[in-house]
């Protein structure tokens, strides 16, 4: 029986790195994917650094590493929408749209087209199967719960998603990273608009 193939979105952060590590330890056929959604020539957007760290993590875990260029799609689907909202004094949440339209739409579709069964991320959320289908639950760490940012996902999207650290507190995720020797175990959590960095 073949192993379930999972494409993990590696962001360069510790959460996605531990997610990839745990899935590999559990026997899944794991690969890593890095999404390029925005890039600049200055230091305002850390895409190049994040990609280098993600690549280093994948090499350490001895798993394949792929990059996906979604710059054009991200600008059309997310950036224009949220910046128009800002102009109207609205505060659309970029992470909700990014998760719905990029990570669990474009990235998921790419994964499926290459023969993967599911995509995984380092979100602090959980998925439960019940009589009505699938339900999105909060992560066990109340300070890190990210279920709100995933609240617009469809059941189809959830059926092909995995959140390997949703049942863990952040402190335990850090400890797993340290014990596993992950190269980004002490890296600080990212800040700023999804994939863009600081916006004035």
Which residues are covered by each model-predicted region?
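Internal nucleotide-binding/catalytic subdomain
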Residues: 152-200
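ATP-dependent adenylation/nucleotidyltransferase module used to activate substrates
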Residues: 1-152, 162, 170-173
């Amino acid at each position: 029986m073949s192993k379930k193939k999972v494409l993990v979105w590696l962001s360069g952060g510790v959460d996605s790195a531990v997610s990839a590590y745990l899935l590999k330890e559990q026997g899944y056929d794991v690969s890593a994917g890095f999404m390029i959604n925005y890039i600049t020539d200055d230091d305002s957007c850390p895409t190049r650094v994040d990609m280098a760290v993600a690549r280093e993590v994948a090499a350490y875990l001895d798993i394949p590493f792929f990059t996906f260029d979604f710059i054009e799609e991200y600008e059309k689907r997310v950036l224009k929408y949220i910046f128009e909202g800002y102009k109207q004094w609205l505060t659309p949440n970029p992470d909700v749209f990014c998760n719905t339209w990029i990570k669990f739409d474009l990235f998921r579709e790419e994964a499926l087209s290459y023969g993967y069964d599911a995509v995984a991320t380092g979100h602090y959320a959980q998925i439960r199967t019940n009589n009505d289908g699938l339900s999105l639950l909060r992560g066990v760490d109340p300070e890190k719960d990210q279920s709100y940012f995933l609240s617009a996902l469809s059941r189809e999207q959830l059926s092909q998603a995995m959140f390997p650290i949703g049942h863990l507190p952040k402190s335990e995720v850090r400890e797993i990273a340290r014990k596993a020797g992950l190269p980004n175990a002490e890296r600080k959590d990212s800040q700023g608009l999804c994939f863009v960095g600081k916006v004035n």
